[in-house]
Amino acid sequence: MQATLNSHAVAGPRQGLVIQLASSLTIVGSVMIAPMLPKITAEFAAVEPDALALVPLMVAAPALAIALFAPLAGMLADRFGRKPMLLLGCLLYALFGAWPVVIHDLKLILVSRLLFGCAEALIMTCCTTLIADYWPPQQRMRYINRQVITIGVVGALFFVIGGMAGEGSWRTPFLLYLAPLLMVPAIVNYLWEPDRRQEESHALITPPGSTRRTLLVACFLIFVGMVTCFVVTVMTPTVLVMRGVTSTSLIGASAGLAILSTLIGSIAWPIVRERIGVAGVNALLLACMACGLCVLALAPSYPVVLVAMVLQGFGAGFLVSNASLPLLLVLPAHLRARGVGAFTACLYLGQFASPLIITAIAHPLGGMPHGLASAILLWALLTMLVALAWLLVGLRQGRMQAGQVLH
């Protein structure tokens, strides 16, 4: 087993693979049980009066828990180390993830899902922080992007696996949450605790004010981006039903196309970023997602909805990598996990808040579902304004760089 504290080891593909697979556990937590919600509702409807309202929270509860617990997860990782907290997160993930197999009370299942979200917060915070700890800036960018791609691929895979595993009983997919136990030996043997003191002695000094600004900008961008992204994820089925599309296969196919477009965007991100810079990519991704929302709200037919999925998904593929990279470049090692924890909290807070925000906007516009299209259009307009602001930032940075070259 590697030493607990290692200042000389060099991270490579093996460490990258372990971290990427561990990161993908966070998406598995939600997508694997989504196909089971109708069966769970049917079982508990007879004994739980609020089943129709509570069952959907089985998907939303982990996101809320991550949003609330991720900052504390960052503090724990900075205080006690990334590797110990990652191991703890994997063990708790398996424990609380599989707990619903033996629980017969819906409210206790929701409690288990909240605790499960806390485990996810530990895993996501530690994995992202380790990428920044192990690799220098250029390689850091590459592994952050691979992390996003792996999460997308594994999420799509387990969406199908969860549906197949639940054909007999809705409880069966929860047994798959024990799989992270197989990763524990790899984490123990192939990952090590980075020597943050040595890194600090060689790090460039970034003014605290600049670090705080970068953190605030990253958190704002990921929150707005995730709200926009999840408008499509959550509201597309309702829009399709309003357009007369009720086939679950067609609705699922639209979600699959969005995932595929997101993967394409993630793969294209390094090339696009090299061409137009971070600010330019921020403007592009927000503009793509805003256009996707507009097309979705105005779509008269299923094929046009698919166009919206492509636009939104492509922009979403840039989001996490482009929002997190500037932050990971400036966070000092002793505060890195706390910064990543705050970023992770805003990411999942955006997911949780998205349907609430759209519902609130729709209320004075005719309520749900009649005011849904207008609410989506209004949020698209706000997103486009943020995109224009980033475009101005990019143009200003370009002029400043041109001036420096001339002088």
Model-derived features: positions:
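Extracytoplasmic gate region of multi-pass secondary transporters
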Residues: 214-256
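Extracellular/periplasmic helix-loop-helix junction of adjacent transmembrane segments
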Residues: 37-67
